[in-house]
Amino acid sequence: MVVLVFALFLGNYLPGKYVNKETTNEKVLLLASEYNGSPFIEVNGNVPYFGEDEYTTESFEIYSELDSLGRCGVAYANIGKDLMPVEERGEIGMVKPSGWHTVKYPEVIEDLFLYNRCHLIGYQLSGENANVQNLITGTRYLNVEGMLPFENKVASYVRETGNHVLYRVTPVFEKDNLVAEGVQMEAYSVEDEGKGVAFCVFVYNVQPGIEIDYATGKSKLCN
């Protein structure tokens, strides 16, 4: 059974209404085993699970505490221009997220390395560098083909309009696995009631041509 990891941290700082329990429904969780060649799949008709009482024009960012296995939980923010960085990203190589392995596959990966330290909330949105509560072990495919286009959409919208985007990224783990099966990404532009940005997707943490042991992070070329 696949589970979404929600740390109690969010409940301590925000009322339960802010962590919508519907995001744990079985239909969403089963998507983790249904990769069909696309980096992502729409969830809930591409409609995010936010409630109207969550919408605000004040920027914020909240990160879950790591669980007992050292895994990240929900990352939740209201992205505004004031959160976005004005300097280049700093060093993050000292962070070793759960399930991390440094391994190369030049046969199938142009950039060589299987894993990236993937920001749940991208650096261009939050300015977070080596925040261990915001970095998971993710494939190059997850990072570049899956998450980045959605992050770019949010970043471009905020820069162009000065508006806010409510944004939540939830890593999905199976049982006690150290590597996430993927992430659920939700976004909603606040001031224009979702006309500029609105999506709810599950992005697969896979790498074509590579077989991953999600329990440990070990990997091998597919036969």
Identify the role of each PLM range.
Residues 1-13:
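Hydrophobic membrane-insertion alpha-helices, especially the h-region
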Residues 53-223:
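Domain-level detector of nuclease and nuclease-like folds
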